[in-house]
């Protein structure tokens, strides 16, 4: 589970401007943190299919944001996947 401090740290690291909280970079970074957190959960709870469906929803949402960013600005897209270490 991400704490408020964790979220603020992620936002601070990925924001484009001082008040930026909704750019695709910030949203993808937050989703990536939640996805990584859930992956740790599934190591202990292999049969938790209800949460697995939520994980797939988060992955799909992140994929859509990454596709949007790729179409809008390829350089920002490449730097983001490199920074977050997302395979693609």
Swiss-Prot record:
Keywords on record: Ribonucleoprotein, Ribosomal protein, RNA-binding, rRNA-binding
SMART domains attached here? Ribosomal_S15 (SM01387)
One GO location term (cellular component)? cytosolic small ribosomal subunit
The record's annotation in Gene3D superfamilies points to: 6.10.250.3130, S15/NS1, RNA-binding (1.10.287.10)
Query: InterPro entries in the record, alphabetically?
Result: Ribosomal_uS15, Ribosomal_uS15_bac-type, uS15_NS1_RNA-bd_sf
Keyword set includes RNA-binding: yes
Instruction: Name the Pfam families on file.
Output: Ribosomal_S15
Query: Quick check: keyword Cell division in the entry?
Result: no
Q: Looking at the record's lineage, which domain of life comes first? A: Bacteria
Which terms does the UniProt entry file under GO BP? translation
Family under the similarity heading: Belongs to the universal ribosomal protein uS15 family.
* HAMAP family linked: Ribosomal_uS15_B
Share what the entry says about its subunit structure, partners included: Part of the 30S ribosomal subunit. Forms a bridge to the 50S subunit in the 70S ribosome, contacting the 23S rRNA.
Protein name as catalogued: Small ribosomal subunit protein uS15
What gene makes this protein? rpsO
């Amino acid at each position: 589970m991400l704490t408020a401090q964790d979220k603020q740290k992620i936002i601070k690291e990925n924001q484009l401007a001082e008040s930026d909280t909704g750019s695709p970079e910030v949203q993808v970074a937050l989703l990536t943190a939640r996805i990584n957190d859930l992956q740790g959960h599934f190591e202990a709870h292999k049969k938790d299919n209800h949460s697995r469906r939520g994980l797939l929803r988060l992955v799909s949402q992140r994929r859509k944001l990454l596709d949007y960013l790729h179409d809008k600005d390829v350089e920002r897209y490449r730097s983001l996947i490199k920074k977050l270490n997302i395979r693609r």
